[in-house]
């Protein structure tokens, strides 16, 4: 009795002591290969962390580190940070971090830090605080291979894995498929990483192109299965997450699931209770508590196949049954089979060779897959659109040139100087050709040609427009009626001078700028496996380009000034101020769009599109403004309209009265005595504009002037009476009209003293 009481007291003392002894805190840190949002391998580990924290009501919040496979520096920094923040249960969930995990476990083996490290065998060093997590998915892969073999319509299945060091999973998948279909063909490739979605997807596409309709994988995300689903076949859930919840039962045939919650709770409890099992080893299995199980089938899977697969799963729950290790094909890899016809588990895990197949089935290994670097050109729609639009505009320019040449003697064309109209249209054609070249893929030739064509095209276009209207301004801005002889041949050197300045700047740009085509990656939303060509130059080339822009800007400003000055011209055929001003303003507006694009970082495709569209739109609108009204008047009023050049002022009526006088009609315009105006007698002479070719010689010109003088003498018998206030104004307008008409067409200048 006394002994019984003593035992009870000891038990009570023990439990009371345990209650008062403060338990250890457990702070979990999980190191992941990728992002926990992958709804796959990393998601399952992170979910187990969260659940364990909730179940155990841990006071210290746990930690997680993601994407550690991206760089060794990031991985090492994560280990250091976890230790610095007081984590005492560190879970290394990535095989890629196993070596570094063992390194830090060795460094801190005397510290109160415990480790769960994913690997297949105990480390060589004695590290009692390290629990090995042998994530053995061989049975799961064998089962999925069996399912794929039964479901395959092509008789070809495949496998994508990080590398040859993980060949065991692929061999298990192949042997499962061969168990289901003896003549199966197996194709495989490696990605070089557990987590590289781009490479995994492209590798899967490559296997699918070789006939595979079901693919297994050892990847931490679903990129491989996305490629399978995109090809129209059923994917397999191989990340540990019930992927039918993401892609739907119609797309996922079967998934295996991993649930690590029990593992986290188990080892965290050991840390809290200070009951850590030295050098522990945890291996996954299909048995209850083994962390592996299968999700439900897709409704597209026939019941007969479901029954066969379920049967196989039940057999595989026997840990002594290892069909993935027991096959004569291992002999071809240099292994010896034991009495049961199997290789050892260690040999199976460390094997880095793909099985070679037998007389019934074959295997094809494509080795490590690398994504070929892909050239990304400008979009075909953009190139086609700009090319077609520019070609149509070139056709319109050619038609306009033909019209100008055919109807060059028509008053409306002749008054605008056909030679300069021709130059303007040629400049526009160069601009449109430059736009076509600008939209093509850059190379050394196109990088130079597109700038040359656009710049020279605009120089000829604007230069001709500027010079021909500068002549109009000089002739009409002449209140003292000074004799000014400005023929086309006197204007051509000015156009040539402007063009020479442009060519000089372009030569400097090309000679010193090192203009070239370069291949670039990482621009325009390109992936690291894509590149495009862009035009490039050095600093001297950039300076020359800025000078070129300033040069064109000055031309625009001068053109704006001249278009403003010729607004006062009251003869419609010579007054092109409105279309010129509109053209210049539109070009200037677009220039304020193009310049910022050229000096600021923008999408290359956007730059090209904007520049080409602005060039086409401004040039086309300018053509319509400058030539549309002329052609319309020729169609509606005839080619020889406005024999005396219509004017909105008194000069026009005076010209008409003089013309009537010449044909025998008398002008009764006498000044009235009521106005007290002095009558002035004026000798009438012909003031009609006479047009002739610029190529006529001086003899013909002299003869024409003599004939005009004879007509003036013959008509001098009658006087024209005009009010004094009208005489000076009318004389100015008439003389300017006559002078401009003659000079536009190469005739000899007539002095105002002849009137």
Curated annotation (Swiss-Prot):
Domain of life (superkingdom): Eukaryota
GO BP terms, alphabetized: aggregation involved in sorocarp development; G protein-coupled chemorepellent receptor signaling pathway; G protein-coupled receptor signaling pathway
GO molecular function: G protein-coupled receptor activity; GABA receptor activity
Membrane topology of this protein: Multi-pass membrane protein
Membrane-spanning ranges: 386-406, 418-438, 456-476, 493-513, 542-562, 579-599, 608-628
Residues making up the signal peptide according to the UniProt record: 1-23
Localization annotation: Membrane
Residues with glycosylation annotation: 16, 183, 273
Cytoplasmic side: 407-417, 477-492, 563-578, 629-755
Positions on the Extracellular side per record topology: 24-385, 439-455, 514-541, 600-607
Stretches for region Disordered: 656-676, 691-729
Keyword tags: G-protein coupled receptor, Glycoprotein, Membrane, Receptor, Signal, Transducer, Transmembrane, Transmembrane helix
Listed Acidic residues bias regions: 694-710
Tagged with keyword Plastid: no
UniProt keyword RNA-binding present: no
Family the UniProt entry places it in: In the N-terminal section; belongs to the BMP lipoprotein family. In the C-terminal section; belongs to the G-protein coupled receptor 3 family. GABA-B receptor subfamily.
Protein name per Swiss-Prot or TrEMBL: Metabotropic glutamate receptor-like protein B
Originating organism: Dictyostelium discoideum
């Amino acid at each position: 009795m006394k002994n019984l009481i003593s035992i009870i007291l000891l038990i009570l003392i023990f439990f009371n002591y345990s209650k008062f002894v403060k338990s250890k805190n457990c702070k979990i840190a999980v190191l992941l290969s990728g992002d926990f949002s992958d709804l796959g391998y990393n998601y399952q580990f992170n979910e187990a962390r969260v659940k364990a924290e909730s179940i155990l009501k841990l006071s210290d919040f746990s930690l997680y580190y993601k994407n550690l496979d991206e760089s060794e520096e990031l991985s090492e920094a994560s280990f250091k940070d976890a230790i610095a923040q007081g984590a005492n249960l560190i879970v290394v969930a990535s095989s890629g971090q196993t070596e570094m995990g063992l390194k830090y476990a060795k460094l801190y083996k005397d510290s109160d830090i415990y480790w769960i490290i994913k690997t297949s065998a105990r480390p060589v060093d004695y590290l009692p605080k390290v629990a090995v997590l042998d994530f053995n998915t061989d049975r799961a892969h064998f089962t999925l291979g069996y399912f794929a073999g039964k479901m395959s319509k092509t008789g070809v299945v495949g496998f994508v894995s990080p590398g040859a060091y993980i060949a065991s999973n692929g061999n298990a998948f192949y042997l499962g498929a061969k168990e289901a279909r003896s003549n199966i063909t197996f194709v495989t490739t490696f990605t070089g990483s557990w987590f590289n979605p781009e490479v995994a997807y492209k590798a899967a596409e490559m296997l699918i192109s070789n006939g595979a309709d079901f693919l297994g994988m050892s990847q931490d995300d679903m990129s491989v299965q996305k490629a399978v689903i995109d090809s129209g076949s059923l994917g397999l859930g191989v990340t540990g997450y019930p992927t039918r919840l993401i892609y739907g039962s119609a797309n996922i045939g079967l998934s295996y699931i991993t649930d690590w919650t029990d593992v986290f709770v188990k080892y965290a409890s050991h840390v809290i209770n200070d009951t850590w099992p030295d050098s522990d080893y945890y291996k996954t299995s299909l048995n209850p508590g083994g962390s592996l199980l299968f999700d439900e089938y897709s409704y597209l899977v026939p019941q007969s196949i479901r029954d066969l697969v379920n049967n196989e799963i039940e057999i595989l729950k026997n840990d002594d049954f290892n069909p993935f290790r027991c096959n004569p094909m291992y002999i071809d890899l240099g292994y010896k089979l034991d009495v049961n016809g199997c290789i050892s588990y260690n040999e199976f895990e460390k094997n880095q060779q793909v099985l070679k197949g037998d007389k019934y089935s074959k295997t094809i290994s494509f080795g490590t897959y690398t994504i070929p670097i892909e050239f990304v050109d400008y979009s075909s729609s953009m190139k086609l659109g700009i090319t077609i639009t520019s070609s149509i505009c070139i056709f319109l320019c050619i038609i306009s040139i033909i019209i100008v040449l055919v109807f060059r003697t028509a008053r409306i064309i002749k008054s605008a100087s056909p030679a300069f109209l021709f130059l303007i249209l040629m400049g526009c054609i160069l601009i449109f050709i430059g736009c076509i070249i600008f939209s093509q893929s850059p190379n050394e030739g196109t990088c130079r040609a597109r700038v040359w064509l656009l710049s020279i095209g605009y120089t000829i276009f604007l230069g001709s427009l500027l010079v021909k209207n500068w002549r109009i301004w000089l002739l009409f801005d002449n209140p003292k009626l000074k004799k000014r002889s400005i023929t086309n041949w006197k204007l051509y050197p000015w156009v040539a001078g402007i063009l020479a300045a442009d060519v000089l700047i372009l030569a400097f740009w090309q000679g010193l700028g090192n203009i070239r085509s370069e291949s670039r990656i990482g621009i325009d939303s390109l992936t690291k496996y894509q590149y495009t060509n862009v035009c490039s130059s050095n600093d001297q080339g950039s300076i020359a380009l800025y000078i070129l822009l300033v040069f064109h800007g000055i031309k625009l400003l001068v053109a704006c000034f001249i278009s403003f000055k010729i607004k006062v011209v009251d003869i419609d055929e010579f007054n092109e101020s409105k279309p010129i001003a509109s053209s210049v303003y539109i070009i200037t507006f677009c220039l304020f769009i193009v310049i910022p694009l050229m000096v600021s970082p923008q999408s290359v495709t956007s730059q090209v599109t904007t520049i080409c569209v602005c060039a086409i739109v401004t040039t086309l609108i300018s053509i319509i403004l400058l030539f549309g009204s002329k052609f319309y008047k020729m169609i509606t009023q005839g080619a020889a309209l406005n024999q005396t050049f219509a004017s909105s002022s008194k000069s026009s009526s005076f010209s008409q009265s003089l013309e009537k006088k010449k044909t025998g009609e008398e002008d009764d315009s006498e000044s009235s005595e009521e106005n007290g105006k002095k009558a002035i007698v004026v000798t009438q002479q012909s003031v009609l504009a006479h047009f002739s070719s610029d190529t006529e010689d001086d003899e013909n010109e002299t003869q024409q002037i003599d004939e005009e003088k004879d007509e003036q003498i013959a008509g001098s018998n009658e006087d024209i009476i005009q009010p004094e206030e009208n005489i000076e104004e009318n004389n100015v307008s008439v003389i300017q009209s006559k002078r401009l008409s003659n000079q536009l067409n190469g005739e000899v200048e007539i002095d105002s003293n002849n009137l």
